[in-house]
Amino acid sequence: MEQITKPHCGARLDRLPDCRWHSSMFAIVAFGLLVCWSNAVGGLILAQLKALGWTDNSTTATFSAITTAGMFLGALVGGIIGDKTGRRNAFILYEAIHIASMVVGAFSPNMDFLIACRFVMGVGLGALLVTLFAGFTEYMPGRNRGTWSSRVSFIGNWSYPLCSLIAMGLTPLISAEWNWRVQLLIPAILSLIATALAWRYFPESPRWLESRGRYQEAEKVMRSIEEGVIRQTGKPLPPVVIADDGKAPQAVPYSALLTGVLLKRVILGSCVLIAMNVVQYTLINWLPTIFMTQGINLKDSIVLNTMSMFGAPFGIFIAMLVMDKIPRKTMGVGLLILIAVLGYIYSLQTSMLLITLIGFFLITFVYMYVCYASAVYVPEIWPTEAKLRGSSLANAVGRISGIAAPYAVAVLLSSYGVTGVFILLGAVSIVVAIAIATIGIETKGVSVESLSIDAVANK
């Protein structure tokens, strides 16, 4: 029989001191993000396939667009399922879809079959990313939620230089025919380990259980967490400061995302993620091809790509240090302006040294923004009752731009060269910076429950 008393899981989670429990939740989510690098190897796989004669600019655009289309569907449907079934079940389900599609894709007999598998990879990955980034915010305290989320993004985005290093090591040892296949099998095996860890150690979100009115289950999970924290710290827990009104949770229908305060947040989140998708995935999927278009050979293009991609973890490390020190709106606007300016300067370079140096700093700022957008700001702006649905809808809308962008990049690269591509990226960045400045909300240091009360009350 369900208990009547509301467990106030949010306030109880927020009062917990940082300890090994937080670190274990962080480690599971971060490792899951680190090894799900099917998207990170996209550009490297395409470079190998181009050497094999499997692809040209048009096919590359299709490969990139179909990946984004899959991620669009995964993000859209994944949030609905995740809000219905819970964070833990969604985590495991989406990992299974992603792993299976990578294994099957690794044995593709031709490009058409690989593109079909790539779509399914995108579905699994799109749903998984929404679940991990948005769901993780429910486990962490509001006082340093941005820092914890940045740490997750920091570890997760080591996948880009890591898979580039693996590609560098594999290129002289394995033929191109087998190289790209191995690059898909490696993350599949590692993701299987992540799934096993989630199955064994990852609890359901007490906040989610409470939002569904499952008070007895929420209380059981919450007590288990609190008892573990007391054992780990050897100290009594601080008093609970109730942030909500104690009322029973309200159901938030999907239609609520299309009106009022929540619609404004959908528009805001979508804009933030449009900039992220267009800039990040253009660089991931096209940078090696851009280098080859400039006359740089395959080996050197992979080396340049690898050196540039080390800016990814460095950028997120910097973001981790400053995330809870700078207002969210200020940080988003500032990063987008820097990306627009530096991207244009980068497009004018011909020296290998300057390409490497400026490319490193460009990727640094891009991944500071990626951390800000995907791991912190967009996941923060939703009430628990609709967190995955809201985040997934914004992700889905944001990914529509990623479907069209590869074709625009292909045309611009062929007609106007590298500069044309980076003018497009700069224009998108400036438009979204204006959107954040005008309709953005401030979430730094604000509790999940405070955001929920405001949004649900005005839905």
Model-derived regions, located:
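Transmembrane-helix signature of 12-pass secondary carriers
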Residues: 1-459
